[in-house]
Amino acid sequence: MNDLIVRLSSLTLENIKNVKKGTVCVPITGITKAGVLGIYGQNGSGKTAIIDALYFLQQIMIGSELEPEIADYLDSDSDHAEITAEFIISSSEKALYEVGYHVQLAKADSRVWINREFLNCSVTKNGIRSNKNIFMD
């Protein structure tokens, strides 16, 4: 599996900063070309929430300890927040992988912890797509 290219295809946030629930879909214009040049929108539309959520997601996925400041980014009216990221991974073997990662963060007082997470994947090879299987829950 050489020459893997990983692209974010969608990001769903729930109770992150000012976003109660929202999904951003990233159009994949070409697997080998850059697709996103910037994020724009009205003030308060969730642009910073997207960037912050991607940072939290990165920290969680590499196994870093959750920073205490993350509690400030979770909606104060809710005891949990959720981030779901969908990725498209292409390989030189002409296989296409659709990978999803979901994490639910729980909050009490100023503490935040991972309450639940799961990872799923499907493979498309030779035009045949497998069902999405959950690998971790």
Kindly label every feature range from the protein language model.
Residues 14-16, 86-92, 120-122:
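A generic structural motif
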Residues 102-137:
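Electropositive, glycine-dotted interaction segments
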Residues 1-56:
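Pre-Walker A-like glycine/lysine-rich segment at the N-terminus of P-loop NTPase domains
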Residues 38-40, 51-110:
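Conserved P-loop NTP-binding catalytic core
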Residues 20, 93-97, 128:
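Short acidic/polar mixed-charge low-complexity motifs
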